[in-house]
From Swiss-Prot:
Transit peptide listed as a keyword: no
Compositional bias segments (type: Gly residues): 594-603
Keyword Nucleotidyltransferase included in the entry's annotation: no
Start and end residues of each stretch annotated as Disordered: 589-609
Protein name: Chaperone protein DnaK
């Protein structure tokens, strides 16, 4: 029997896990990491980079690097690169293909089946788009499972026979969910779920970026938001600072050569961010997690004291302020520390894959639909057929009638949401039931049936009880992809798989070389165009030019050894260039501080004292 994997397709990072001898194992990727950045980049030579290699080159390839695409799933978002349009499911499929390859390399066999997780609060269109991404990646998606449910499954299977109530607080890179589950005797039942599909760690990063932009503008007068490359560097620095502040009270954010001033002099960003300041600028984001928590407690009608365990999911829950808020909301209950928040969802997905494949016995997973489903009736009212937090799979029917005399057809508009007015909810799709015999209004009987499968995907049927005529819609328009488009994308992905594998081997070296060439050329150009002439001798610049030309020549070919050699030489020349810039800057500063032409350094000054200390340190270290 072919193996099945569990995949946590995340906004920021993704994880793949598999069952080995009945136990879930998180698979390390080809770079040796257990998490893979959900980043896809299109290099200018046509190569597609996924994961860490894509993230590494983002600074020099901003417009062709896509991250956090999960936030666009189910919408009409697309990006055009080299005259080709890519949809969100297509980009997500690239991440899934890498996870599939890495798992196949680990297992030594092909993988066809997968369970993929989604945020509990994902609507029908977003779920369908995720399933489409799996198909494009060459995977048979056995089941779409809610992330908190997968986490509870991973957490709860070894907790014995006693029934327990578990609260899962899931704050990821781009989405937030709270779910309340009951676990006991091999049954995992979701009682209620709530959340926010546009709240996650990315938003905390954005606040730090805004803070840095304001600080830099205040000191230099330059607005970095107009510089795409600078903004990419700020984003990476913000994420790093956020992570560091989870374990320390302050962090330094130091970005050399972030931009240049009007005189082409390089400028540096150097700021100190404390945990207190970080929490101050992100407090409103934290407060947005309160309402979904309260909603889940209200929907289930339980008391906070009835919660037995609190499980934190998602890397963003490592922030101390988040942990403290969860403790406050749960009446001082200490969150469970026995699970890895980055991996627990993929582990649960692998277990569910095992259940569906028959490898894991005596486990029943009862999930719920996160939002109410219904149709628009007279007056634009939303008439709900399936209430939110109903256990799935489920099927509900209700009989409606016509609003006008001799009405020959009815338009069925399917909505998802909690608002009383249909138009304020999410329109999932619409279809028409025709051929209704002429009759006074209120006489025809139209039975509308909603059927939600275990993936949370909706099928709606309308049937005229008088004639037996019926029409059915499977809600899939939300993904924006037809079956033909999905088939085309699958073939396209398969055709490029071998080519991608060949290119991947040289990707890291090539990215590093391209980055070095770009940065070096930029600074050489700035020096030559500087007012008052370059601060660096022309022969130094010429040597750098020659090294750049050699590196470009190597990059034009496919010899990795030649690229490495040229990169090392360019690195040496770049260091010489940097040293010359610093020496010239120091000489200018010394001349400015020594009026009357006195030789700088004729008297021992503060600089000499620092030099002496450095020498002493070196001697002591020897």
């Amino acid at each position: 029997m072919a193996r099945a994997v569990g995949i946590d397709l995340g906004t920021t990072n993704s994880v793949v896990a598999v069952l080995e001898g009945g136990d879930p194992v998180v698979v390390a990727n080809s770079e040796g990491s257990r998490t893979t950045p959900s980043v896809v980049a299109f290099a200018r030579n046509g190569e597609v980079l996924v994961g860490q290699p894509a993230k590494n080159q983002a600074v020099t390839n901003v417009d062709r690097t896509i991250r956090s695409v999960k936030r666009h799933m189910g919408g009409d978002w697309s990006i055009e690169i080299d005259d080709k349009k890519y949809t969100a499911p297509e980009i997500s499929a690239r991440v899934l293909m890498k996870l599939k390859r890495d798992a196949e390399a680990y297992l030594g066999e092909d993988i066809a089946d997968a369970v993929i997780t989604v945020p509990a609060y994902f609507n029908d269109a977003q779920r369908q788009a995720t399933k489409d991404a799996g198909q494009i990646a060459g995977l048979n998606v056995l089941r779409i499972v809610n992330e908190p449910t997968a986490a509870a499954l991973a957490y709860g299977l070894d907790k014995g026979e006693k029934e327990q109530t578990i609260l899962v607080f899931d704050l990821g890179g781009g989405t937030f969910d709270v779910s309340l589950l009951e676990i006991g005797e091999g049954v995992v039942e979701v009682r209620a779920t709530s959340g926010d599909n546009h709240l996650g760690g990315d938003d905390w990063d954005d606040r730090v970026v805004e803070w840095l932009v304001d600080k830099f503008k205040g000191t230099s007068g330059i607005d970095l938001t107009k510089d795409k490359m600078a903004m990419q560097r700020l984003r990476e620095a913000a994420e790093k600072a956020k992570i560091e502040l989870s374990s320390s009270q302050s962090t330094s954010i130091n970005l050399p050569y972030i931009t240049v001033d009007a005189d082409k002099n390089p400028l540096f960003l150097d700021e100190q961010l404390t945990r207190a300041e970080f929490q101050r600028i992100t407090q409103d984001l934290l407060d947005r997690t309160r309402k979904p928590f309260q909603s889940v407690i209200a929907d289930t009608g339980i008391s906070v004291s009835d919660i037995d365990h609190v499980v934190l999911v998602g890397g963003s829950t490592r922030m101390p302020a988040v942990t403290e808020l969860v403790k406050e909301l749960t009446g001082g209950k200490e969150p469970n520390k026995g699970v890895n928040p980055d991996e627990v969802v993929a582990v649960g997905a692998a277990l569910q894959a095992g259940v569906l494949k028959g490898e894991v016995k005596d486990v029943l997973l009862l999930d719920v639909t996160p939002l109410s489903l219904g149709i628009e009736t007279k007056g634009g009212v939303m008439t709900k057929l399936i209430e939110r937090n109903t256990t799935i799979p489920t099927k509900r029917s209700e009989t409606f009638t016509t609003a006008d005399d001799n009405q020959p057809s009815v338009q069925i508009q399917v909505y998802q949401g909690e608002r009383e007015i249909a138009a304020h909810n999410k329109l999932l799709g619409s279809f028409e039931l025709t051929g209704i015999p002429p009759a006074p209004r209120g006489v025809p009987q139209i039975e509308v049936t909603f059927d939600i499968d275990a993936n949370g995907i909706v099928h709606v049927t309308a049937k005229d009880k008088g004639t037996g005529k019926e029409n059915t819609i499977r809600i899939q328009e939300g993904s924006g992809l037809s079956k033909d488009e999905i088939d085309r994308m699958i073939k396209d992905a398969e055709a490029h798989a071998a080519e991608d594998h060949k290119r991947r081997e040289e990707a890291d070296v090539r990215n590093q070389a391209e980055t070095l060439v770009y940065q070096t050329e930029k600074f050489v150009k700035e020096q030559r165009e500087a007012e008052g002439g370059s601060k660096v001798p022309e022969d130094t610049l010429n040597k750098v030019d020659a090294a750049v030309a050699e590196a470009k020549s190597a990059l034009a070919g496919t010899d990795i050894a030649a690229i490495k050699s040229a990169m090392e030489k360019l690195g040496e020349e770049s260091q010489a260039l940097g040293q010359a810039i610093y020496e010239a800057t120091q000489a200018d500063a010394a001349a400015a501080g020594a009026p009357g032409g006195q030789p700088g350094g004729a008297e021992p000054g503060a600089d000499d004292v620092v030099d002496a200390e450095v020498v002493d340190d070196d001697q002591e270290s020897k």
